[in-house]
């Protein structure tokens, strides 16, 4: 059985080290600063998957690296590729737990959606991610490794495609794993490594107001998205348990602080649930709620991917989405209906992992 622990006993991934930490580790072990820069270059520019491929590093130091670290800690279990080019990956962690990562082809490039936790405790009643409660946080290396394996998948195709955008919107609440997510952001944004621009990275939160305030002060120029999904406290609390701890008044005070501090736009994610949150009245409430920050906010209307375990919910019909959208536009709200990806595979966040675990349990029963 996988171990439920945040302090695993396996060797850490070298991806867990920021560039400054790698330099400090190399110096501590008798090497010069430039040696760490060479290793960093091998990892993020040449993208090797083994220390033994680092041909300008001494055998003794490679042995030391192998003794203390692995390169990529993930094992690829399943890859599903959609007709629209979306690719969904199921990765196995060193302790046997499973996570999902999704590659989406956009008109502006390749965008990867990463997972930050094994399971989720936020408890949104419509979401596949929360079907399994949080087991543990991913460390920085395990989050970074998702990007590296997706990039490897495309490197092996030899077409020169490069991951250009990252969305931290996979399984888990990123701000509930704050330190590791922040290290991940700084690693992938490092100019000497993957050099993915901060404005090409989006972090999504379900609304941990105190962490939004903290994030505003980090000086990290990435984009912030907030999973809103309802325009009033009663409705939001009924579908998102987090609202009972951070009601809309607290959440929007934090969002206003973030905007004032960073002068950056916030995107609101709003999943369209038929007969639940998709009426014209709901749209007017949403327009009123966001009025004060209209110039620096944006609403993303999201078609719902049905989840069998949450069969009380269904996708809003096209005409209801259009009516909702029209109300927002008439009120001057910047909004868009999100383009769908991967509708012919296990598209909903957490679905591939959940379905695979079901199959694994069924196989185990048959084998008993």
Curated annotation (Swiss-Prot):
One of its GO terms (molecular function) is tRNA (adenine(37)-C2)-methyltransferase activity. Its main location: cytoplasm. It is an enzyme of class 2 (transferase). Residues 106-344 form the Radical SAM core domain. [4Fe-4S] cluster binds at residues 120, 124, 127. It is found in: Cytoplasm. Binds 1 [4Fe-4S] cluster. The cluster is coordinated with 3 cysteines and an exchangeable S-adenosyl-L-methionine. This is Probable dual-specificity RNA methyltransferase RlmN. It comes from Streptococcus agalactiae serotype Ia (strain ATCC 27591 / A909 / CDC SS700).
